Amino acid sequence: MASKRINKELRDLQRDPPVSCSAGPTGDDMFQWQATIMGPADSPFAGGVFLVTIHFPPDYPFKPPKVAFRTKVYHPNINSNGSICLDILKEQWSPALTVSKVLLSICSLLTDPNPDDPLVPEIAHIYKTDRVKYESTAQSWTQKYAMG
C-alpha cells in the first residue's frame, strides 16, 4: 500500500511540482527522500536553498512522514536537529495530505512562523519582541548555511 502511494506522489510531484520545491528518492529506497526548498522571497530566508529529508513510515499514508531540515535554519519552529514543529506532521496529519502539501506548508511556515507553539522558545521570544533582530539573524544564518 505505502509503496504504491509513494510512487503515485512521486509521479504527481514530477508532473506538477509545488512552487520553489523539489523532492524525490535519495537512491533506490522509495521510503527515503530528499527535498529542496527555496527560501520564500518575502521572508528572511530569501535566496537560501534548504535541504530537507523525508522518511516515509511503512504504514504511510496512515502515519505522517518524518520530515527534517538538514540545512541549519534560524526559526522558532525548527530546532538545531532540524526537527519541525508543524501540526500536519503530528496530530493534524491526514492520509489525504501529500508530500507536495507538506512542502508547501513548510514554505509558508518559513514566511509565517508560529511563535505560540515554538520548538525553540528563545527564537520565538526574539521573533515576538524584536522582529528586526529576528529577521537579521535569520538572514545571516541563511547566507552562512543555505547559500553556496
From Swiss-Prot:
* Tissue specificity remark: Ubiquitously expressed at very low levels.
Highest taxon of the source? Answer: Eukaryota
Against InterPro entries, the record matches this protein to: UBQ-conjugat_E2_core, UBQ-conjugating_AS, UBQ-conjugating_enzyme/RWD
Tell me the ranges covered by the UBC core domain, including all copies: 1-147
Q: Which GO terms describe its molecular function?
A: ATP binding; ubiquitin conjugating enzyme activity; ubiquitin-protein transferase activity
Q: Which CDD domains match?
A: UBCc_UBE2D
Which pairs of positions does the record mark as disulfide bonds? none
Query: Which pathway does UniProt place it in?
Result: Protein modification; protein ubiquitination
Q: Which PROSITE patterns does the record cross-reference, listed alphabetically?
A: UBC_1, UBC_2
Supply the enzyme class, top level: transferase
The protein's UniProt keywords, in alphabetical order, are:
ATP-binding, Nucleotide-binding, Transferase, Ubl conjugation pathway
**EC number annotated for this UniProt entry:** 2.3.2.23
Gene Ontology biological process terms, A to Z: protein ubiquitination; ubiquitin-dependent protein catabolic process
Which residues are the active-site ones? 85
- Transmembrane residues, as ranges? none
Q: Which SUPFAM superfamilies does the entry link to?
A: UBC-like (SSF54495)
Give me the reactions it catalyses: S-ubiquitinyl-[E1 ubiquitin-activating enzyme]-L-cysteine + [E2 ubiquitin-conjugating enzyme]-L-cysteine = [E1 ubiquitin-activating enzyme]-L-cysteine + S-ubiquitinyl-[E2 ubiquitin-conjugating enzyme]-L-cysteine
Gene3D superfamilies xrefs? Ubiquitin Conjugating Enzyme
Which family does the record assign?
Belongs to the ubiquitin-conjugating enzyme family.
> Which purpose does this protein serve, as stated in its record?
Accepts the ubiquitin from the E1 complex and catalyzes its covalent attachment to other proteins.
Q: How does it assemble?
A: Interacts with RGLG3 and RGLG4.
Q: What is this protein called?
A: Ubiquitin-conjugating enzyme E2 30
| Source organism of this protein record | Arabidopsis thaliana (Mouse-ear cress)
- Gene that encodes it: UBC30
